């Protein structure tokens, strides 16, 4: 949990903005969304494999586009 100490003469809005930024950097909201509902291990593996396949397809498409001639 990120801790923010309110500085002297600092407005609430600025302190809240700093807190939100530190929470975003720590990845708290993403973690909460991921843990909101139980996900079976097989579902987790399927999702991770799908993202891996998508990443590889994107990389291959980029390499093929780089190697094709434009004339």
Curated annotation (Swiss-Prot):
Coiled-coil stretches are none
Q: Which superkingdom does the taxonomy of this entry point to? A: Bacteria
* PROSITE patterns in the cross-refs: RIBOSOMAL_S21 (PS01181)
Task: Show the InterPro entries listed in the entry.
Answer: Ribosomal_bS21, Ribosomal_bS21_CS, Ribosomal_bS21_sf
Record has Lyase as a keyword: no
Q: Which GO terms describe its cellular component?
A: ribonucleoprotein complex; ribosome
Q: Which UniProt keywords apply?
A: Ribonucleoprotein, Ribosomal protein
- GO molecular function annotation: structural constituent of ribosome
Question: What are the recorded Gene Ontology BP terms?
Answer: translation
Q: Where is the composition biased (Basic and acidic residues)?
A: 60-71
State the NCBIfam families in the record.
S21p
Q: Which family does it belong to?
A: Belongs to the bacterial ribosomal protein bS21 family.
Please state what the protein is called.
Small ribosomal subunit protein bS21
């Amino acid at each position: 949990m990120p801790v923010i100490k309110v500085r002297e003469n600092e407005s609430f809005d600025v302190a809240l903005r700093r807190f939100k930024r530190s929470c975003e950097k720590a990845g708290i909201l993403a973690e909460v969304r991921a843990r909101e509902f139980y996900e079976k291990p097989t579902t987790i593996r399927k999702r991770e494999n799908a993202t891996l396949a998508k990443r590889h397809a994107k990389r291959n498409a980029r390499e093929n586009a780089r190697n094709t001639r434009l004339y």
